[in-house]
Amino acid sequence: MDVNGDRLRSDIETNATFGAIDAEAGRGRTALTGTPPNRRGREYLVDRLEAAGLAVRVDAVGNVAGRWVPDGVAPDTPAVATGSHLDSVPRGGIFDGPLGVYAALEAVRAVQGSDVEPARPIEVVCFTEEEGQRFAEGLLGSSVAAGEQSVEAALRLADDDGTTLDTALTEIGFRGEGRLDAREWDAWIELHVEQNDRLEAAGVPVGVVTTITGITHCEVVVEGETDHAGATSMADRDDALAAASEFVLDVESAAREATTADDTAVGTVGRLAVEPNATNVVPGRVGMGLDVRSTEYATMNAIVERARASLARITRERDVTTGFERSFDLRPTPMSERCRETPHTACTAVGIEPLAMHSGAAHDTMYVASATDAGLLFAPSRDGASHSPREWTDWADCTAATRVLAETVAALST
């Protein structure tokens, strides 16, 4: 099946102008949900969807869906859906999300121009706030579409300035009505950049994801005693940061040891808030954010328990008080069998031997998989770079992956 790589590139490069930033290397953009660059990106997408003959709707949380109903197909037949997101992280790259959205549109165009006779509608979907940079933890639009979060709760979410999602979407003209319901889809398939270098190292343009790792976030607090850095002897200190540093190293050790049996395991303390955070003051309090991931939930639990044990030991040995809360928890998400096998067959049909792989990053597909059969494809990321202007996927790889997506969508819809 033929796809138009030049048209795909044009759409992605046009989207890259919305929120474009100056970068010493590469191309970057900042398009947070509900901002003017996000509005321009959404408006361009709607124009392109309508130009391809898709009927566009926007739901209450700003999810955009363009639906193509082939001749002779009942409009209410469960659709095959495909897409991704258009929001970005601050100073992010131009492929993360937009590749999946515009590859989805190009896949529909390819099916429209082929001799394939789909028995189902095909929907191109752009989810709201995948990145979680302004509202909530991320994967917001897909969590609502999957029924994991209510429209009302999502609209009440506010950014650091107190602006709610409801207000932000209204201001850019994308506060629609109703709820996009993923349970009404027969299947879902997403194309995304890999955000790692495994495909590049293997020289393969397409990866078929088997499982998306689970994610646990834990909020950790260590409280000691604030004191004068010069006047307080070393023997008399209850240094919260020194105690927290032991915890960070213990988490690293626990995760490294876990990889001997599970090479998908990772553990990261990625956020520290030190109080009072002054050079001449012994730290009295440290707040930390712990991120644990694996394709095996038992491994995640084991690392979390090692973290708890570390904190208990530190409490005893360092005369500090501690707190630990497992605040966010998503189990590993296996892709459905047919949404793994169909793209694998599509790869073979176009002469590509795909790489089977897991995803260490979260994607909207995680939530959609709770509502219908779901699959995820990867395209290579140069040097594994992402969430940065250095993020890059060669245009030839974009086209090859889009061709596989088109073949997959065609097969799922017939």
Give the predicted meaning of each segment.
Residues 18-22, 162-210, 242, 248-256, ...:
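Active-site-adjacent substrate-binding region
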Residues 228, 237-258, 307-309, 379-414:
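His/Asp/Glu-rich mid-to-C-terminal helical/loop segments that flank catalytic regions of hydrolases
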Residues 1-28:
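N-terminal hydrophobic or amphipathic helices/low-complexity stretches enriched
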Residues 82, 92-130, 218-222, 233-254, ...:
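Alpha-helical metal-binding/catalytic segments enriched in His/Glu/Asp
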Residues 30-33, 268-277, 289-291, 321-340, ...:
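A short beta-alpha structural unit
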Residues 23-69:
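A non-catalytic alpha/beta surface segment that caps or lines the substrate-entry region
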Residues 129-130, 136-297:
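Midchain, well-structured core segments that form catalytic/ion-binding scaffolds
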Residues 8, 21, 80-83, 354-404:
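Zn-dependent metallopeptidase/amidohydrolase metal-coordination segment
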